[in-house]
């Protein structure tokens, strides 16, 4: 009788332990997923400027110099201003960017990153203190090694001349393309770059 009760007690304890572990496993899995839930703004800051947690996810493919500039006091101030402008000018954009990334669709991501560059140019045109330059720069200009759509924001200096200060931040989209081809305009290369970006974010 005692041995039966003991066995029953052990079975009960093991059952409780197993269900507890399963519960903890689900909880930790959910927490991990929640930790990788980002807003459209998080994606924007991370992919274009290497800021925040998204920036850290793709940090191995970032140019340290540009990340430093983007995360400087001046850089953060400039990016904050850009984000504020976009939210006012195109309130739906950040949600659209998030949807394109969450859907893991490279083509949609390409569309939204191209739109991001257009919005940044629009911001620069409306801001007297900031200039936008589309000049191509060296192959080490930012994310993934070569610029697809090179763009820099410059804070206007005292003499109203566009200067490349610590606040000059790259708006280039996929430089990863160089690893596949010398042609940055090739659609298949752009899709490969977008797919790599999505993989890094969703790993």
Curated annotation (Swiss-Prot):
InterPro entries noted in UniProt: SdpC-like
Recorded phenotype for the gene knockout or disruption: When the sdpA-sdpB-sdpC operon is deleted, increased rate of spore formation; a double operon deletion (sdpA-sdpC plus skfA-skfH) makes spores even faster. In a single gene deletion no SDP is produced.
Induction, per UniProt: By Spo0A during nutrient starvation, through its direct negative control of AbrB. Repressed by AbrB during regular growth when nutrients are plentiful, in association with the transcriptional repressor Abh. Protein not detected during exponential growth, accumulates during stationary phase (at protein level).
Propeptide: 33-140, 183-203
Keywords tagged on the record: Antibiotic, Antimicrobial, Bacteriocin, Disulfide bond, Secreted, Signal, Toxin, Virulence
Entry GO terms, CC: extracellular region
GO biological process entries: cell killing; defense response to bacterium; killing of cells of another organism
Complex formation: Proprotein probably interacts with chaperone CsaA.
Function: Produces a 42-residue extracellular sporulation delaying protein (SDP) that collapses the proton motive force (probably both the membrane potential and pH gradient) across the cell membrane, which leads to autolysis; may form a proton channel. Induces the lysis of other B.subtilis cells that have not entered the sporulation pathway, inducing cannibalism to provide a source of nutrients to support sporulation, and at the same time delaying commitment to the energetically expensive and irreversible onset of sporulation.
NCBIfam families noted in UniProt: toxin_SdpC (TIGR04032)
Protein known as: Sporulation delaying protein C
Originating organism: Bacillus subtilis (strain 168)
Gene designation per UniProt: sdpC
């Amino acid at each position: 009788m005692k041995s039966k009760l003991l066995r029953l007690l052990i079975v009960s304890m093991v059952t409780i332990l197993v269900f507890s572990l399963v519960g903890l496993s689900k909880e930790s899995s959910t927490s991990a997923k929640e930790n990788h839930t980002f807003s459209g703004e998080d994606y924007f800051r991370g992919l274009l400027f290497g800021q925040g947690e998204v920036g850290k996810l793709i940090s191995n493919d970032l140019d340290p110099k540009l990340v430093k500039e983007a995360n400087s006091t001046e850089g953060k101030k400039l990016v904050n201003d850009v984000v504020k402008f976009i939210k006012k000018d195109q309130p739906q954009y950040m949600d659209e960017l998030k949807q394109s990334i969450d859907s893991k669709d490279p083509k949609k991501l390409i569309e939204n990153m191209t739109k991001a560059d257009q919005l940044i140019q629009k911001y620069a045109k409306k801001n007297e203190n900031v200039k936008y330059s589309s000049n191509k720069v060296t192959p080490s200009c930012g994310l993934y090694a070569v610029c697809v759509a090179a763009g820099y924001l410059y804070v206007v200096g005292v003499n109203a001349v566009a200067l490349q200060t610590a606040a000059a931040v790259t708006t280039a989209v996929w430089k990863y393309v160089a690893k596949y081809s010398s042609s940055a305009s090739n659609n298949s290369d752009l899709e490969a770059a977008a797919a790599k970006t999505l993989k890094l974010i969703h790993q």
